UniProtKB/Swiss-Prot annotation:
InterPro entries: Kinesin-like_fam, Kinesin_motor_CS, Kinesin_motor_dom, Kinesin_motor_dom_sf, P-loop_NTPase
GO cellular component, as recorded: cytoplasm; microtubule; microtubule cytoskeleton
Predominant location category: cytoplasm
Record's protein name: Kinesin-like protein klp-3
Organism the protein comes from: Caenorhabditis elegans
Amino acid sequence: MDSHVGEVDIFQQCKYIHEVELVNMKLQMRILETHIETKDRLLRNLEDIIDEQESRIANMEDFIQGRATSYTNRSNMLKGISVLSLDFGNLSEENLRLKNALSQMQKVARVNELLETDEDYESDMTSNEDRFALSRDSSCSVPRSVSPQPTGDVIKPYPQMVQSMREEGHWKKLQRCAEELKTEKDELKRLALDTKDAFNVCMAEMRMMLTSKTTDFFRVLIERYKAEMEKRKQLHNQLVELNGNIRVFYRIRPQLASETDNQKPVVVIDEMDNGVVHVSNTTGTRKTSAGADKVIPTDFSQDQIFNEVSPIITSCIDGYNVCIFAYGHTGSGKTYTMDGPVTMPGINQRAIMQLFETAKERTGDIKYDIKVAMMEIYNEKIRDLLNTSNTNLAIRQTEEGRSSIPGLEEVSVNSAEEVTETLARGRKNKAVAATEANIESSRSHVIVRVLVSATNLITKATTVGRLNLVDLAGSERVSQTNATGQLLKEAQAINKSLSELGNVVLALRQNQKHIPFRNCQLTRILEDSLNGDSKTLVIVHLSPDAKSLNESISSVNFAEKIGQVFTKSGTMKREPTRRSMTGISSGQRREIPASPRK
């Protein structure tokens, strides 16, 4: 019974089904060994009985034949039969114990099967990993089948045999898991390679399709962009032309403190039409102007004045030549309008700053290069105000029909500080002199030329525009200034150039075939701004002082003469890229409303 209890304890120590199976297999092997041993003992007992029977038969023969006097050895046979019966009894008892053990094993196997889901098999494997590694070699040497041992051999202790077989089962199971994982890894690797190849093929096809689609899309987009830019330019140009390629503004200077004593201004704006001015005095001299494009009131600030003239600068951005010049007699406020003091800069600096702002708004599509040059026409000689060593420059005409001045210094500007410094440097070099009309009278025509080169990064087209900002010398009569000597010579040169400017305007008004641009340096320089599709704005300055009555009337006459000119477009030869657009939205442009002319 102790052996039976030990077998039950072995089954109870099993925690997993595979351990129960191993124990069951080993018990079966032990049963076989026990049966073999029992059969061997039975065979030996039978041999002993046979020997005893043979001896007994021999004794009986001897006794019958008279060779022996008595018959013996009965006790030996009974002893053999007793031993054989005892062995059979032992065999039956062994079978009973084995049956009980098998029944108990089935119960334990069922319990372990129910508990298997709650056990952490991986934890048990990890805790025994080192022990398996140490006993692997010895486990592998355990024979897979147990052959019957001779009766005299020593059988390995049962617990040690169970432990060896348990470890061998663990090792085989781990090997199978490792082989399965390796197989799955190889399959996943092949699947990954196949997926990668398929993905690369798909991406290549997608890339080709996207490249084709993108190329077509951008081609259509650029074509539409060019068409829209051309249409916008045409509309803007038509609007400017409707207002007149040459436009005329009047600006009436405010009265000075010395002019307000018991004196009414001789120049006033018509109460019914703000595009008409009246020039009159108490003696009956009177002049009423024809309708101008705009009359700037005396209370307008420098900022308000620039807001009125800024739309024409858009044409310069689009590649047209633009000229804004101030006309009037000495003391009427021309230089104040164009230059202005440091605290209230005039049109020159504000116009260049507007170009910077426009360039900044469109830096994504347009690359701009802005250069500034300053010159004066003094006694019909062109002097470079930024390089005083250039005192007598010549005018040349390019193959495209543009006027060019070789040797004129052009300074690239990139900030407001550079613009201010450049204009101040040129301003201090211009020619001035004291006359009876003004203590610091400009004795030359001062021209600030701004060159705007714009390259469209999308269309690769280039636009070149010129902005001429002209402060004309005083238009007063020689008799009023009482000039003599050098001042007289300067006044005669000034009046001659202004007269030739009037002749050019008259020829344009009459659509003459020959326009006398070459009669003076001023008209030659301004030829691009007066001819073809260029845009010109003339600000005629009038003084409310009674002493300047005749000069104001003369200025009004000049304004009426040039205000009736309508230039013919398309007479200039231009590069194909001249029409490329740099683009300004309609919301950013302010157009100057035209007033009806009388």
